[in-house]
């Protein structure tokens, strides 16, 4: 693992000001560390939200249903992880944008606000809702 990424997981202050860290972390190679960070009581709230966002990026980009059984297993693992950390996922909703919010709502079994445009809901389904 790259030294900066290892430090991001181990040092609560490291990388807190790094923009788009969720995109950097959205790598299947880091999935065990992402899951462990969500389980870590010492993990910061801000970074846990980044982890949820990274998981959503993985779900969107690495789990298309037409890629076969491996992709389906990965998607279910990510969804299960998000469900296990529903409290963090719900707090992340205001930070991930409307499409990913709908993805989270779908994973958590929460209703989509009725005033959300249909295109947002449709896009969320494309991204793993």
Ranges and model annotations:
Residues 1-2, 109-112, 121:
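Intrinsically disordered, low-complexity regions enriched in Ser/Pro/Gly/Gln/His and often acidic
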Residues 1-35:
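Short terminal alpha-helical segments
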Residues 21-23, 28-117:
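Extended alpha-helical scaffolding segments
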Residues 117-125:
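Internal helical hairpin/lid segments
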Residues 127-129:
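Eukaryotic intrinsically disordered, low-complexity regulatory tails and linkers enriched
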């Amino acid at each position: 693992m790259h030294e900066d990424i290892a430090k991001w997981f181990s040092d609560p202050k490291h990388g807190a000001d790094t923009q788009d860290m969720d995109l950097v972390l959205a790598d299947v190679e880091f999935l065990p560390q992402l899951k462990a960070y969500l389980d870590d009581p010492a993990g910061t709230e801000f970074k846990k939200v980044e982890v949820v966002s990274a998981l959503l990026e993985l779900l969107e980009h690495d789990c298309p249903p037409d890629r076969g059984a491996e992709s389906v297993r990965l998607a279910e693992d990510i969804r299960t992880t998000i469900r296990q950390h529903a409290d963090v996922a719900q707090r992340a909703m205001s930070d991930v944008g409307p499409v990913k919010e709908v993805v989270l709502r779908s994973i958590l079994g929460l209703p989509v606000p009725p005033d959300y445009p249909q295109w947002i809901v449709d896009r969320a389904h494309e991204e793993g809702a």
